Amino acid sequence: HSRLFLIWGRNPAVTNPHMMPLIKEARARGALAIVVDPVRTRTARDSDRGVHPRPGSDGHLAIGMAKAMLAHRPVECPRIAAISDHFDAYLGLVDAMPMDEVLARTDLPRETIEWLALTYYDTRPATILQGIGLQQYTRGAQTYRLIAALGMLAGHIGVPGGGVNFGNWPWPRMRHVVAEDRRTAAPRTVPVSRLASGLAATTDPA
């Protein structure tokens, strides 16, 4: 159903190759694929357009996009306030940041940010596909919230082909239900950032 894929901080051509045929099929039917990434990745090269902000400025870009949508499109603020928490505080945060600061932080021209925001708003339905790179900076969780809020502002939440996606890692849930009654030892964990050395250092469970 999606008519626009906003691929933000994600390189599915390398990390999610199973996703690319679906995106290519949608593009063949007229959908757009736009990549937001500081790096000109393989996915960006295969997309309709790439937007390349300064590393770590994704939250500022999301605020700039929100400012553009609020200024140039009929955002349904009363409806959003009724179905969300702290929307007034969010609007205050967006309003408090001057667009000039957004431009300075992201190293992007105003025209690019406004084009990205209004293309995302106008193309229906649109989905945001976020990657895990966005969380590798200070205020990473807040950055995800700012990006998710764009889906609410544009009205892409709760519609087929819309939404804001972040990869779900299922194994923390699975370990609670798989053969739980046959456990003889507590579950072990290995840091993802040191997966190879961590696995090499493990021993057989007792």
List the model feature ranges, each with a label.
Residues 1-159, 164, 168-171, 180-206:
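Cofactor-pocket helix-loop regions in the catalytic cores of large enzyme subunits
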